[in-house]
Amino acid sequence: MSSEENHVREDAHQHTLSVILSPEERVGLFSLTTVIMATIRARILESFDDNDTNKKTSTEISDYCTEYFDNWQDGVIEIVGAAINYRSDVALEVERFPTDRVVQVSKDIQPVAYHDTAADEVLLTEYPPIPTLLCALPNNKRLLLLEGMLLQLLLLNKYTAYSRIFLLYLTSSLQLPLSVLVDDEIRVAQYLIKTAKLMSGSNELEKRSESNKISRRWKIGLAGVAGATVMGVTGGLAAPLVAGAIGSLMGGIGLGTTAAAGLLGALAESGIIAEVNDFAFLSLKNPTNQTIMQGDHRLRVTIAISGWLVTEEDIINPWFTLGHQSENFALRWEVEALASLGTAMQSLVKSTAWNLAKKEIISQTVFSSLAHALWPMALLKIAKVLDNPFSVCMNRADKAGVILADAIINRVQGERPLTLIGYSFGARLIYSCLKTLFERREFGLVESVVMLGSPVPSDVAAWKSMRSVVAGRLVNVYSTHDYILSFLYRTSKIQYGIAGIQPITSVNRVENLEVSDIVNGHLKYRDVMGTILQKLKWEGIDHDKIANQNGYSVLYSDVKPE
């Protein structure tokens, strides 16, 4: 960092969190920050426990992961320390600050009532509050503190998955509802885009002549936003981000229908791209014209992936229950292969052979059929109807997952935390993507993942590798009534299990949700996506639209409802 940049940062932080907080409160914030960091680091290390068979490899990967985290942590500590004037009064106070007093204050105060929402329940469960005297602050002060910390984190010129996990812990510890953080994220994203648009519209010659003068003001702007908010100043708050990192942070603003070739790095010269068709991102906000309006941009990105198709609308339709809190995209990939699979599955479940065979399957249970290859002869005779489309989709999903991973590594989403949701072969694609991120030692990019009806193994090693690259929630959704998935997977390595029909065990912090009561067949996932996300108490879903989805295009099921 140059001396000029250091001078800018020092000037910027003269009017930051130190304005909002008293010296004692600044000590509390610094202490809380360090405890949250230690908590997140411990969560990361849980993915690499002592029971791993290959301890040398596990230790090596753990070192990669924690090295990335520690570098991010150092940046955060530096920024927070500068914002609260750490080198002056706080440095002395931290050593003698009574930790037991923090706990006692937390027990004695009356917390602000949480919003009675499912998302807040998950916030408390997944990111339990850390005792701190800061939760005794007046409500408006806590609101300013949370917003100020969000803006301080953005001074890193990125908003990583770890940054968001940190803010989730902070929100919980300040005893604020999740909606407060989400509203802050939306407001900041819109202001950044608005400011960037205004800048890009100014005269180029004027920009060049003024660049040296305004660059310094811009860098001060966001750094001082917390103090500026207190003082009622509204201009130039997004300045340093706009000046240095708006392109990288909000890189996904041009995601739209971008195809793979223009956004890949290491794979650009490989043959994998040529083997995958129709790889593009489609905005869920404006699916007709794919225009992303200024007000639709967010600090977080969600990519939703369908796993089979009946019509091309199935690329987008299952996902309309995703809310406005994130910038949502559907991945268009291998339309022809997925449509072929969808048609084949529909043909199978309507066939006489399937209707007769499923009774026998049910009587034996899925697991015994898999373990002993006890599939009805009539069903095996028509297996070729499904086996070829299944094999093609399996192969293409694995390749498309590698491409998605490369796109993520090359920041197609910008420097923003990413959520991935997929069912059937969409889940297989995510599996391949996460494995690739793991193999390439890319951590801190993915915030949360939901995989539904996954044609992927349930073995511990595979899920530990995925767990290590997902900073937040990793969810396996399965149904023991998914007989089609069981039948399709019979030629694969069934000794490793099937995640789509059973829970994942012996892996820390992998959530399992059984949906056998509402998913009575593989074709059902598309119809009840919103209901499943609601069962998960997923953040950022549109509850008003979920009831409508339940009546959407009801398809044939593997098994008739009881």
Where in this protein do the model-derived segments appear?
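Amphipathic alpha-helical protein-interaction segments
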Residues: 1-210, 304-306
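Acidic, Ser/Thr-rich intrinsically disordered and amphipathic helical segments
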Residues: 31, 60, 71, 75, ...
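Conserved aromatic-histidine-acidic binding/catalytic patches
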Residues: 137, 155, 291, 392, ...
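Residues that form ligand- and interface-recognition hot spots within folded domains
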Residues: 153-157, 163-165, 171-174, 180-185, ...
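Serine-dependent carboxylesterase/thioesterase catalytic core
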Residues: 211-271, 378, 382-499
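Membrane-engaging insertion elements
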Residues: 242-314, 318-319
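Lipolytic serine-hydrolase domain surface
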Residues: 287, 294-297, 302-391, 398-402, ...
